[in-house]
Curated annotation (Swiss-Prot):
Lineage of the organism: Eukaryota, Viridiplantae, Streptophyta, Embryophyta, Tracheophyta
Binding site for substrate: 178
Annotated site residues (Transition state stabilizer) in this chain: 77
Gene Ontology MF annotations: heme binding; lactoperoxidase activity; metal ion binding; peroxidase activity
Keywords, ordered alphabetically: Calcium, Disulfide bond, Glycoprotein, Heme, Hydrogen peroxide, Iron, Metal-binding, Oxidoreductase, Peroxidase, Secreted, Signal
Disulfide bonds: 50-130, 83-88, 136-337, 215-247
Localisation: Secreted
Record's protein name: Peroxidase 36
Positions annotated to bind Ca(2+) 1: 82, 85, 87, 89, 91
Additional remark text: There are 73 peroxidase genes in A.thaliana.
One Pfam family of this chain: peroxidase
Entry binding sites for Ca(2+) 2: 209, 260, 263, 268
Enzyme class: oxidoreductase
Length: 344
């Protein structure tokens, strides 16, 4: 199916769209809820109120991907950055308003978070189909899954029924999202704070098998990793030389580099294979193979067993997607994802 065809389908009755036509064949992993705090979430939440919701989302994700393959990683990243700040409540999508400062202004998001226009477009289509029904938080969970699938990764049932926050937390976004230079212990502490464990950490960082990083995100590894003008000794020298050609010691801050230089747009296990060969782009990636025997063994296992990685990734995505959801009468269903309803 070409891009023109997908565009023409976006506005028609999407309940008849075949998932096989839009997405590559994939393995769907069954996952299960395990805590009472998310018992009100269900894969069938919109079965009666908006039965075409998932087909609409899938169609628009496909269109966005065909227009810009980078978008898959970008909208997946929004879900991560949302869930790590006061739970999966779509607070990352809110623009600044009045005294509320947007999470988009944090170091983790400023000049790098993207895909907001795609979310706006999908939300508009959902509002036309089922007004004030599908939350922006659920939309982020769905686009994350569909972005993985369209890149060749695993699928899973997305539990739905989240509601949207009325507030953003710039401070939370500054404090709770790991940086490219974070130590393994710092990253693990942040994951543990969200109820995620070491297994989840290693699996979820595998999402870096797609996407990009700016030069500014890893330059220190190339030239001054220890603070003594020395490069990172855990970085393959040939790979480092290649990176230095496009990421000099100064300038070119915004130059983009693939997180996985072998299969940059395919969701597979090459992320782990690269780490084994000391060709992880970010310091916060390579440390999985260099700072802990336990994580090293997991990296080697996933490098050799893509199916095991896919299965654990799906489980960990469900677990992450269930972090502190607003349900029942908490929060609201935003009509526009960038603004709370009283500002619309």
């Amino acid at each position: 199916m070409n891009t023109k065809t997908v565009k023409s389908m976006a506005g028609i009755v999407l309940s008849q769209i075949s998932l096989v036509a839009l997405f590559p064949l994939c393995i769907c992993y069954q996952t299960h809820q395990s805590t009472s705090s998310v018992a009100s979430l269900s894969p069938q939440f919109y079965e009666n109120s908006c039965p075409n919701a998932q087909a609409i989302v899938q169609s628009y994700v496909a269109n966005a991907y065909f227009n810009d393959p980078r978008m898959a990683a970008s909208i997946l990243r929004l879900h991560f950055h949302d869930c790590f700040v006061n739970g999966c409540d779509a607070s990352v999508l809110l623009d600044s308003s009045g005294t509320m400062e947007s999470e988009k202004r944090s170091n983790a998001n400023r000049d790098s978070a993207r895909g907001f226009e795609v979310i706006d477009e999908i939300k508009s289509a959902l509002e036309n189909e089922c007004p004030e029904t599908v939350s922006c938080a659920d939309l982020l969970a769905l686009v994350a899954r569909d972005s993985i699938v369209i890149c060749g990764g695993p699928s899973w049932e997305v539990y739905l029924g989240r509601r949207d926050a009325r507030e953003a937390s710039l401070i939370g976004s500054m404090e709770n999202i790991p940086s490219p230079e974070s130590t393994l212990q710092t990253i693990l502490t942040m994951f543990n704070f969200q109820g995620l464990d070491l297994t989840d950490l290693v699996a979820l960082l595998g999402s870096h098998t797609i996407g990009n990083s700016r030069c500014i995100g890893f330059r220190q590894r190339l030239y001054n990793h220890t603070g003594n003008n020395d490069p990172d000794q855990t970085l393959n020298q040939d790979y480092a030389s290649m990176l230095q050609q496009g990421c000099p010691i100064s300038g070119n801050d915004q130059n983009l580099f693939n997180l996985d230089y072998v299969t940059p747009t395919k969701f597979d296990n090459y992320y782990y294979k690269n780490l084994v060969n000391f060709r992880g782009l970010l310091s916060s990636d390579e440390i999985l193979f260099t700072q802990s025997i336990e994580t090293m063994e997991m990296v080697k296992y996933y490098a050799e067993n893509e199916g095991a990685f896919f299965e654990q990734f799906a489980k960990s995505m469900v677990k992450m997607g269930n972090i502190s959801p607003l349900t029942g009468t908490d929060g609201e269903i935003r009509r526009i994802c960038r603004r709370v309803n009283h500002d619309v």
